From Swiss-Prot:
Keywords (A to Z) from UniProt: Carbohydrate metabolism, Glycosyltransferase, Transferase
Annotated Pfam families: Alpha-amylase (PF00128), GLGE_C (PF21702), GlgE_dom_N_S (PF11896)
Active site per the UniProt annotation: D411 (nucleophile), E440 (proton donor)
Top-level enzyme category: transferase
Protein name: Alpha-1,4-glucan:maltose-1-phosphate maltosyltransferase
């Protein structure tokens, strides 16, 4: 061998030795792959709430023809098993298995999938073929004796399951018993149930564990009502035209009305001091006149303070405590707007100029979302002093928690670093697990989804702009299935920022349609005050209310809401929601096709393990989407939630009661509906399956 050949050969051997074997995860004896749900490769917790079932899926298979079984298992933070359910093949041929787990207490949990070789199922499959054919009958029952004796060791003494297996074993062991008698004993319903409850397991395999965080129920279910405290009780002098602001105490007097409509969360915009520099006037004008209160989102003043202070015209912390206390007395929680931005007058601007972005000319950059400009707001720069900003914001949030705030509606979280939220929400999950954060993030789907992944409990959604049947159907399926493990939706027909063309043009009927869809389509929904007065006039060229409350006082006469019936409808919807667990659930939604593109229908279900009486609760919703004209349609019911099939003669299979009108109907699988936007625009139907 030449010197060159020797060097080349040595180099090749050295190269082979230096290449490390690739990392891999060993496949278990019974392969368990593609486990869901999981987030960030199983490092971030998926979402659930107390008594809310969630589905676990996995692809499970094995070599050969022997049978296997699987269970989904939920363990609490201490490692104790709190739920364990069999998994069923939901995609025959694809070996996709599913089981629904139901946590009962809040806090960190983990789930895993366990699979095993099932000798009883394998034996039974073989026996049902061999015994009738007279093949190896003696051997078949000899195997059964061994199997049933092993099963006896795993069943509790004096249990019904043990008795069933023992009795079957007695028959199987009789030498003179007929083979068909032995087989009948071995496959009786009692024996099958015993092996299901206490299976004989071989080749037990487990997936890795995946984290779940179980929140309190309000993280999933809530009826929100937004009001501006400064508008409630605001008065205007008839001679001078000067306004006197409403206060937190006058706003507290309005809470009885809100609670009377069935709302359980009262949401208020920022109550902090409002800056004077570049203060916005009415309808977002650049010039404010004396008496204009400014935008509550331009937070901070030299004299009164910043995020840890209260706008003097609203009152004091004592007044805030009165407001919160009254809300709690009425069974409502208070959600406070958390807007991480500053007016030019905010104390942080002078104390921490590094927390803002400086332009080349030395001025501070104000907020922009081209073509929109917010000259009265400075956005924070989270990169210059991230630790300093983090500590201060956490201090501020904890201050308001100490004053009884349990929910924060976070303004534009998508304009702040995701890592900031991940840290803040993780620490609050440990230190203040009762506190809920809603993301007001009308932004791109990846950002919305990731904000949910890192810990936001709820999110505003695109529901506001989903008006057509197909849009609504697709969006309901998206939020209830595809994204339910990471993002909980909140459906709002309008907000103080958004007034859609559909609401602008459709009048009372449009408002009713959207309220019904919001209240039934999502466990959390919300109404911005004035909705019950049909405030639907937009500022020209904008999708927001004219004379917007963000820039002026807006006292209202709510007696008018009784005349148009909207307050009655909102009250009815909240009452129906409180009565039906199905409307308090997100994941079990199915679409019912209809023969009319202007009529949408869907079914929502609460599983038996989610209800107090252990009986499935189901609601069918049918809505006319046309605010101008009556529509009729045939509704083609998806019967899978009820586990029933159509009758051979087309006769009725369910009894439905309209929770809005009180009328009861007998329906087959394809009922006819007629809905009038000026009368009954929708059906919200409870369901009873006919025997």
């Amino acid at each position: 061998m030449s010197t060159l050949q020797h060097k080349t050969s040595s180099a090749r051997r050295s190269s082979r030795r230096s290449v490390a074997a690739p990392d891999f995860v060993a496949v278990s004896r019974i392969p368990i792959v593609e486990v869901s749900p999981q987030l960030l490769d199983g490092t971030a917790p998926v979402k659930s709430t107390v008594d809310e079932s969630f589905p676990v899926q996995a692809t499970i298979f094995r070599e050969g023809h022997d049978k296997f079984a699987a269970r989904a298992v939920l363990v609490d933070g201490a490692g104790h098993t709190v739920d364990s359910v069999p998994m069923c093949d939901v995609s025959p041929g694809l070996f996709r298995f599913e089981g629904w787990l139901t946590p009962r207490v809040p806090g960190p949990h983990r789930f895993f999938v366990e699979a095993w070789s099932d000798p009883y199922a394998t034996w039974l499959h073989n026996a049902e073929i061999k015994v009738p054919a007279g093949i190896d009958v003696g051997l078949v029952f000899a195997e059964a004796e061994v199997l049933f004796k092993a099963a006896l060791k795993g069943t509790p003494v004096r249990s019904g399951e043990r008795a069933a297996i023992r009795d079957a074993l007695t028959v199987i062991s009789k030498r003179r018993a007929l083979p068909e008698v032995k087989l009948a004993a071995a496959r009786s319903e009692e024996v099958r149930a015993a092996f299901a409850a206490y299976p004989v397991k071989e080749l037990v395999s487990r997936s890795r564990e995946y984290p779940v965080f179980v929140d309190r129920v309000r993280a999933l279910v809530g009826s929100w009502y937004e009001l501006f405290p400064r508008s409630v009780g605001a008065t205007r002098d008839s001679e001078s035209g000067e306004w006197t602001s409403g206060t937190l105490r006058t706003a507290a007097t309005d809470l009885d009305r809100v609670a009377g409509m069935g709302f359980d969360v009262v949401y208020i915009p920022p109550v902090h001091p409002i800056g004077l520099t570049n203060r916005k006037g009415r309808n977002n004008s650049l010039t404010a006149v004396p008496g204009d209160p400014g935008s509550p989102y331009a937070i901070g003043s030299d004299a009164a303070g910043g995020h840890d202070a209260i706008e003097p015209s609203l009152g004091t912390f004592e007044d805030f405590d009165v407001f919160v206390g009254r809300a709690h007395e009425l069974g409502m929680e208070v959600a406070l707007d958390l807007a991480l931005q500053c007016s030019p007058d905010h104390p942080w601007v002078k104390e921490h100029p590094e927390w803002f972005t400086a332009r080349p000319d030395g001025t501070i950059a104000y907020a922009e979302n081209p073509p929109k400009k917010y000259q009265d707001i400075y956005p924070l720069n989270f990169d210059n002093d991230p630790e300093g900003i983090y500590k201060e914001i956490k201090r501020v949030v904890e201050l308001w928690v100490a004053h009884g705030v349990t929910i924060f509606r976070v303004d534009n979280p998508h304009t702040k670093p995701v890592g900031f939220w991940q840290r803040l929400l993780a620490e609050f999950r440990v230190e203040h697990p009762e506190v809920i954060f809603l993301a007001e993030a009308f932004t791109n789907p990846p950002m919305m989804q990731t904000l949910g992944t890192v810990g936001f409990h709820q999110s505003y959604t695109y529901f506001t702009w989903r008006n057509e049947r197909q849009e609504i159907e697709e969006y309901l399926m998206e939020v209830s299935h595809e994204s339910s493990h990471r993002m909980r939706p909140a459906f709002w027909p309008t907000t103080h920022d958004i007034l859609t063309p559909y609401i602008q043009r459709g009048g009372i009927s449009a408002a009713a349609i959207r309220a019904i869809l919001a209240a039934t389509g999502s466990p959390t929904w919300g109404i911005y005050n004035g909705y019950e007065l049909i405030e639907n006039i937009a500022r020209p060229g904008a999708e927001e209310h004219i004379d917007n409350e963000k820039y002026e006082f807006k006292p209202r006469n709510y007696a008018l809401a009784e005349q148009n019936g909207m307050a009655t409808l909102l009250t009815m919807l909240n009452s129906i929601r409180s009565k039906h667990k199905a409307l308090q659930r997100l994941r079990n939604v199915t679409i019912n096709p209809t023969s009319n593109d202007k009529i949408v229908s869907f079914t929502k279900v609460a599983r038996p393990e989610e209800t107090a009486d252990g009986v499935m609760d189901a609601v069918i919703v049918v809505v006319n989407l046309d605010p101008y004209a009556s529509r009729d349609a045939t509704v083609y019911l998806d019967l899978s939630p009820f586990g029933i099939s159509p009758r051979w003669d087309g006769g009725p299979i369910i009894e439905v009661t309209d929770e809005m009108s009180g009328e009861t109907y007998l329906w087959n699988e394809a009922p006819y509906v007629h809905l009038d936007p000026h009368g009954q625009v929708a059906h919200v139907l409870s369901v009873k399956v006919l025997s």
